[in-house]
């Protein structure tokens, strides 16, 4: 009896679509979801964010850190 190979569903970018949230450096609640508990930016292969939106997200997180809206490192 041959088993079917495990089919992993392709994740969809959370920032694409009609009612998708806009990436904004002032929206710290949204940005916090894409930062690890150590304060690092989570890679797109884990969050399923597209490459273009991952660059926007990284820039927004870095801008928020510079303006002291987000911490650089978490204790």
From Swiss-Prot:
Gene3D superfamilies: Ribosomal protein S18. Keywords: Ribonucleoprotein, Ribosomal protein, RNA-binding, rRNA-binding. InterPro entries: Ribosomal_bS18 (IPR001648), Ribosomal_bS18_CS (IPR018275), Ribosomal_bS18_sf (IPR036870). GO terms for molecular function: small ribosomal subunit rRNA binding; structural constituent of ribosome. GO terms for cellular component: cytosolic small ribosomal subunit. GO terms for biological process: translation. It comes from the Bacteria. Part of the 30S ribosomal subunit. Forms a tight heterodimer with protein bS6. HAMAP family: Ribosomal_bS18. Belongs to the bacterial ribosomal protein bS18 family. Binds as a heterodimer with protein bS6 to the central domain of the 16S rRNA, where it helps stabilize the platform of the 30S subunit. This is Small ribosomal subunit protein bS18. It comes from Cereibacter sphaeroides (strain KD131 / KCTC 12085). The lineage of its organism: Bacteria, Pseudomonadati, Pseudomonadota, Alphaproteobacteria, Rhodobacterales.
């Amino acid at each position: 009896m041959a088993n079917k190979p495990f089919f992993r569903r392709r994740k969809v970018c959370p920032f694409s679509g009609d009612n998708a949230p806009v990436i904004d450096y002032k929206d710290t609640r949204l940005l916090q979801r894409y930062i690890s508990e150590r304060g690092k930016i989570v890679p797109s292969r884990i969050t399923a964010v597209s490459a273009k939106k991952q660059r926007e997200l990284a820039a927004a997180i870095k801008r928020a850190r510079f303006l002291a809206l987000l911490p650089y490192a978490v204790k």
